[in-house]
Swiss-Prot record:
NCBIfam families: Obg_CgtA, Obg_CgtA_exten, PRK12296.1, PRK12297.1, PRK12299.1
Top-level enzyme category: hydrolase
EC number per UniProt: 3.6.5.-
Recorded family membership: Belongs to the TRAFAC class OBG-HflX-like GTPase superfamily. OBG GTPase family.
Compartment(s) of residence: Cytoplasm
Cellular compartments per GO CC: cytoplasm
Domain annotation OBG-type G: ranges: 159-332
Gene3D superfamilies noted in UniProt: GTP-binding protein OBG, C-terminal domain, GTP1/OBG domain, P-loop containing nucleotide triphosphate hydrolases
UniProt binding sites for GTP: 165-172, 190-194, 212-215, 282-285, 313-315
Chain positions recorded as Mg(2+) binding sites: 172, 192
UniProt-recorded name of the protein: GTPase Obg
Gene: obg
Main localization category: cytoplasm
Length: 430
């Protein structure tokens, strides 16, 4: 098992702006405000698709954006709400905020959904701001900005296919040819000390996880060499590719190697041999390999062994593609292992109280301008429609009620000093 990780950027849609409008109809002299509300912005939602096995698709697309809501209209008509954007992920995906590492959710069940970027609410139209003192307000809210963040997706991946065989039969070389994995490769035994995994993606869209597992030796089922540690990984694979090298320079008998590996597998767990196993004759580009293979087939037939044999050369790529296609076919016919079979360390969640930050911060620049920052005040600014005088006055009252005037005075602001919020600058008035 290994953890696949990918980082994506998501942005929810902005809410639609509320409208400033008035009824202008015949025989309705006191029409009043009639500006409708903006529509809700679309959210970005992760949804579990049990047909997915990996995070491969996110290697090619990193940005996901939802549409904004429609603006409000005259005659109290609401703007259209935007549709949500759904992003499919495989079961077992853990979702974290990439900046804070906060755990946002664990997605395990097919169809389970998680909102990772919430769409902004629509701004209110001027029909909401009529009062006894102001029956024709030119006040409307802009739509709330949609949530924008970076997300870290993590998937604990079990290998679908395991490469087994004696050390240096070509497992690491084959893995490097069919995936983007870069295992350590050399012509001596026990090059691979830990499992290397890679994603195989076929032209027809099928994909699976292939594991290059440490080489077996006699007595592995009793713990010799890498022993039990290796066999535990084989136990979790659904298809076994048994690699036998056809190299007459090693002085080894391919059939004896084949029998010995299967004996170790059976000694550890007889059920392993019940899984689909394909014999892969490697290094078929070497002189004398054809003769060795013919002898191997004769011994196999004499023993009544009917396992299918694929001849490959990882150097020339001979026979590699048919082998991968056959492997994908076998996986389609073989049941998956439940995620619960994997032993997980028990972890205790610790929840800490996070006090809400200040509504705003005031800092004075070298040029004397006072800059106002803070999530709450910036959100208020973005939702304020400052195209009309009524909207400007309402925004000023809201800032005053938040205590901004007093905070500016404490920082030394005087009448006429410049104050900036985001890209909006105004003069401080005592």
């Amino acid at each position: 098992m290994f953890v696949d990780q990918v980082k994506i950027d998501v942005k929810a849609g902005k809410g639609g702006d509320g409208a400033v409008a008035f009824r202008r109809e015949k025989f309705v002299p006191l029409g009043g405000p009639a500006g409708g509300d903006g529509g809700r912005g679309g959210s970005v939602i992760l949804v579990v698709d049990e047909g997915l096995r990996t995070l491969m698709d996110f290697r090619y697309r990193h940005h996901f954006k939802a549409n904004s809501g429609g603006n409000g209209q005259n005659k109290q008509m609401y703007g259209r709400g935007a549709e949500d954007t759904f992003v499919q992920v495989p079961p077992g995906t853990t979702v974290r905020d990439a900046d804070t590492n906060e755990l946002l959710g664990d997605l395990t069940e097919d169809g389970q959904e998680l909102v990772i970027a919430k769409g902004g609410r629509g701004g209110r139209g001027n029909m909401h701001f009529a009062t006894a003192k102001n029956s024709a307000p030119e006040i409307a809210e802009n739509g709330e900005p949609g949530q924008e963040r970076s997300i870290q997706l993590e998937l604990k991946v079990l290998a679908d296919v395991g490469l087994v065989g004696f050390p240096s039969v070509g497992k690491s070389t084959l893995l490097s040819v069919v995936t983007s994995a870069k295992p350590k490769i050399a012509s001596y035994q026990f090059t691979t000390l830990v499992p290397n995994l890679g994603m195989v993606q076929l032209d027809d869209g099928r994909d699976f996880v292939l594991a290059d597992l440490p080489g077996l030796i006699e007595g592995a089922s009793d713990g010799v060499g890498l022993g039990i540690q290796f066999l535990r990984h084989v136990e979790r694979t659904r298809v076994v590719l048994h690699l036998i090298e056809m190299d007459d320079q090693t002085g080894r008998d391919p059939y004896e190697d084949y029998q010995q590996i299967n004996h170790e597998l059976e000694s550890y767990d007889p059920k392993i041999l019940e899984r689909p196993q394909v014999i892969v004759a490697t290094k078929m580009d070497l002189p004398g390999s054809a003769e060795l293979l013919a002898e191997f087939k004769q011994k196999l037939a004499a023993a009544g062994d009917t396992h299918e044999i694929f001849e490959i050369s990882s150097i020339t790529h001979q026979g590699v593609q048919p082998l991968m296609n056959k492997t994908a076919d076998l996986l389609a016919e073989t049941a998956e292992f439940p995620m619960g079979d994997v032993e997980e360390a028990q972890t205790q969640k610790l929840y800490q109280y996070q006090p809400e930050g200040p509504a705003f911060n005031v800092e004075q620049d070298e040029d004397g301008t006072f800059y106002i920052t803070g999530e709450k005040v910036e959100r208020l600014f973005k939702m304020s429609n400052l195209d009309h005088q009524d909207g400007v006055m309402r925004f000023a009252r809201q800032l005053r009620s938040m205590g901004l005037d007093e905070a500016l005075r404490e920082k030394g602001a005087h009448d006429g000093d410049l104050v900036a919020i985001d890209n909006f600058t105004f003069e401080f008035v005592e």
